[in-house]
Amino acid sequence: DEQSGISQTVIVGPWGAKVS
């Protein structure tokens, strides 16, 4: 998350968890 200063974002959707 950019607001948290973390370069890694985790997106959770119908397909499951995705790390980009």
UniProtKB/Swiss-Prot annotation:
Keywords: IgA-binding protein, Lectin. One of its GO terms (molecular function) is carbohydrate binding. It comes from the Eukaryota. Tetramer of four alpha chains associated with two or four beta chains. Belongs to the jacalin lectin family. D-galactose-specific lectin, binds the T-antigen structure Gal-beta1,3-GalNAc (Thomsen-Friedenreich-antigen-specific lectin). Potent and selective stimulant of distinct T- and B-cell functions. Shows a unique ability to specifically recognize IgA-1 from human serum. This is Agglutinin beta-3 chain. It comes from Artocarpus integer.
